[in-house]
Amino acid sequence: MLEYLIVGQLINTHGVKGELKATSQTDDPQRFKKLKWVYIDKNGSLEKYDINGVKFFKQFIIIKFQGVDSIEEAEKLKGFYIKVDRANAVKLPENSFFISDIIGLKVYDENNQLLGELKDVIQTGSNDVYVVRDSDSKEILIPALKSVVKEVSIEEGKISVILPKGLLD
């Protein structure tokens, strides 16, 4: 499991006083209002930044970090990812997982046959869809429904599914 989770990306400056515009990579952008600090991933080097203010503008989050007081300073942070440590991550309901924790798990069918590796999760609104790549690099799209996904074991690196009839046809 990753120690830090991506919650957003700094995409541009906002104004001239050091604010930054960010996109959310979390289900609940309002969580930014509860954060007191975050980590900025500067190409693999994490730096802690205290948050002085958060507001929302259209689909974006406007963040003011302590010590970033000019457009020039803000410009240096553009493009970097915003991360939180697990202690500050949202508490998930039982049998729910962070996408970053399940990417890379092996996916097996009801006969314990390897289908492939989970490469991505598409969030459709109604239910997630797992993108599984098999040994021939073919993608299988599997609905992440309780009736399909029977077990997720991060410890074993495994997801067990019962495929709907006709899914592989």
UniProtKB/Swiss-Prot annotation:
Keywords: Chaperone, Cytoplasm, Ribosome biogenesis, rRNA processing
Annotated protein name in UniProt: Ribosome maturation factor RimM
Compartment list: Cytoplasm
Entry GO CC: cytoplasm; ribosome
Domain remarks: The PRC barrel domain binds ribosomal protein uS19.
UniProt-listed InterPro entries: PRC_barrel-like_sf, PRC_RimM, RimM, RimM_N, RimM_N_sf, Transl_B-barrel_sf
Domain PRC barrel: 93-167
GO terms of molecular function: ribosome binding
Domain of life of the native organism: Bacteria
Function comment: An accessory protein needed during the final step in the assembly of 30S ribosomal subunit, possibly for assembly of the head region. Essential for efficient processing of 16S rRNA. May be needed both before and after RbfA during the maturation of 16S rRNA. It has affinity for free ribosomal 30S subunits but not for 70S ribosomes.
Family to which this protein belongs: Belongs to the RimM family.
Record GO biological process: ribosomal small subunit biogenesis; rRNA processing
